Amino acid sequence: VALYELIERLQAHAASALAWFDNFDLLVTPTVAAPPGVLGDYLNRYVSGLGSAFTRPLNVTGQPAMSIPLGWPDDGLPRGVQLVAAYGREDLLVRVASALEEAAPWSHRKPAL
């Protein structure tokens, strides 16, 4: 595949993904596709795709996104959600993240290492 063809395919993918936001304000996904691993295991998760399955597509579309901790299961390790908005809607991300933190405060929590 020629480089220009790849660029055209990526641009078409981005346009399709962005059109989704014509009907919705926000997309909420897990930040990663698996529970947190042990310290030093990130490279294995990244190579397998589990570390970036939900975040990687946004590198193509260029949409604003943020990840915040939202759950703390019994293992004491935070689970994150990724908030994704349309172009130029960083304000929406910050407002929603602020409301979620107010409803379920987490800044005082620290995972055991």
Residue ranges and their predicted role:
Residues 1-60, 110-113:
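Serine-dependent amide/ester hydrolase catalytic core
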Residues 4, 60-113:
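Structural helix-boundary/capping segments
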